[in-house]
């Protein structure tokens, strides 16, 4: 919270000088992005702010992996790494586990022992990109920009 307040004050200083600002994000600024903390603060202070949509990491990863996220009436669940894993895996349909790098060993163990079709993308579209087709091959040292797409075995699209 303190760092977001500090950033908003700095941005306001530039805006007060008549400058235009851009806050670039990886992915879309409305999905688990730091930008939204800044956006809320600046608009609450009376500044105008426009959000320009980007390509979400899970859509980019699904395209790179040639995986359908949702077919027919299959629900899609986008879950942050901090979401309780067991609860998330019990949800029906497609589960996208985002930013799970810190706990990838735990994620991998749960997926290997379950009846899941799994794909993983790390650093999708960036240097060091890794694409994985099986839970057993998920690296336990996966980085921050890793996401896992989970479906039930035999489900279409994975």
Outline where the language-model segments fall.
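Predominant activation on well-ordered alpha-helical scaffold segments within soluble catalytic domains
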Residues: 12, 36-39, 59-62, 105-108, ...
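Class I SAM-dependent methyltransferase SAM-binding "motif I" and its flanking Rossmann-like core
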Residues: 30-91, 139, 153-156
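A contiguous loop/helix-start segment that scaffolds small-molecule binding in enzyme catalytic cores
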Residues: 16, 21, 89-158
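Short acidic active-site motifs
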Residues: 6-10, 83-87, 106
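General beta-strand structural signal in soluble alpha/beta enzymes
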Residues: 23-25, 51-54, 120-121
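Class I S-adenosyl-L-methionine
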Residues: 1-48, 132-139, 146-147, 151-157
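Short beta->alpha junction loops/turns
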Residues: 27-28, 55, 100-101
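Thr-Gly-centered strand-to-loop micro-motif
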Residues: 25, 79, 97-99
């Amino acid at each position: 919270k303190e760092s977001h307040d500090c950033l908003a004050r700095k941005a306001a200083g530039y805006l007060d000088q008549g400058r235009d600002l851009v806050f670039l994000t990886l992915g879309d600024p409305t999905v688990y992005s730091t930008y939204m903390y800044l956006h809320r603060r600046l608009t609450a202070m009376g500044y105008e702010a426009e959000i320009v949509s980007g390509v979400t990491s899970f859509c980019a990863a699904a395209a790179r992996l040639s995986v359908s996220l949702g077919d027919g009436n299959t629900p899609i669940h986008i879950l942050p790494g901090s979401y309780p894993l067991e609860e998330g895996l019990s949800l029906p349909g497609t589960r996208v586990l985002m930013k799970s790098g810190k706990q990838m060993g735990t994620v991998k163990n749960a997926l290997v022992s379950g009846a899941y079709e799994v794909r993983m993308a790390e650093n999708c579209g960036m240097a060091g990109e890794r694409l994985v087709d099986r839970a057993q091959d998920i690296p336990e040292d996966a980085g921050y920009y890793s996401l896992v797409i989970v479906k039930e075995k035999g489900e279409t699209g994975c």
